[in-house]
Amino acid sequence: MRRRRFLELGVAAAALAAGQQKPKEEEAVTATATQDQTPRVGVVLSSFQGSEDHDGAKVTGLADPQPVDKDLTTAQIQAMLRKALEIGGLRTGGLETIIAADDWVVIKTSIESCHGLGPESRYVPGAVTDLRIVQALIAFLAGHRCGKRITIAEGSPEWRPRERSNSPVDGWTSEWGGAFGGLSYKKMVEQFSQRHSAIRFELLDLNFDETVEMPVPGDALAKQNPDGIYHVPKTIQQCDKLISLAPLRTHPLTGVALSVANYLGIGPGSKYGFPKSGLMKLGAPDEVIVDLFSYHPADFAILGGSWGVEGDGAQSVHHNLIIAGANALAVDTVGAAAMGFNPAQIRHFQLAERKGFGGWDLDLIWTRGNDVERARRPFRKPAGWKPAPAKKA
């Protein structure tokens, strides 16, 4: 956001007490750290050494900053996440102020593909959520007593759970060729269950969760879905808090696939088929994305890791960056800008704003930590993607 003049509340109060009329230009306060309507987004490169907010508040840097293209240890990337959670929350505090001790928390991760299913199913760095970030997020939640039940959920278009297929591996049990130090989701849940017996940890395939048929809250956008009704997993409908956790990734149909587009994974394959072609019959992907997002807009969103994916999906980008905040559209706006995209040309951003889920104007987003320009690393755009006509915010 552009630097704005921040009024000293004490001075204003003193002037009011003295009976002085406040100048009109001072009445037109735009955005301050004390106004929650301005979304805050934490931006943390692995090289982050500290910064200063627009109101003069200091933000301490990472204890062990590293180059943005260096392979990171688990401890280093987890420190990045903790910093992003700290500075990307609300005025009242970070993620720990959003989630209550007795909440049912769903972490919607992104595991579209699965390493080890066959000779063609290899892990492409950046194509799935970094498991070390998931691990660090759960450790944060458990350590701050945020959540009584924590569910890691995904509904992949490509793989099914082992118990429903003949495959020896699935997205929950894959160790991704050692990319995350031998970590798998199954191991992760087992370890946390042993350490925190008072919390229920679980894995859930949204493709086979119980569903309800529900109209889209507000107006449905998908033009081939005149009734505006979707099958919605009960887990998504009934959980108290939902965190969308996705890599920085391009997509041939939507330009980028970040925390809002992560909601394509909630459309159950048991109802829409594999690879969920039934969803795409209901309308354009951007429309379906925002329809699905409407059922339970993310309470918090986290993007990035060590790797992302550019172009049409096969080319990895090494860029150590984590972006986090309580408004998913604001987080995606910063993420898209960091990838070299114009947020005004992403159609599902436009649609999400139209439905009241926030805005995509960088000038109206309080970025904390690294500046967006400093975090920018242009990603190659998908060959067939057509930017939407840019609209004014």
What are these regions (language model features)?
Residues R3-A393:
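N-terminal and secondary-structure boundary signal
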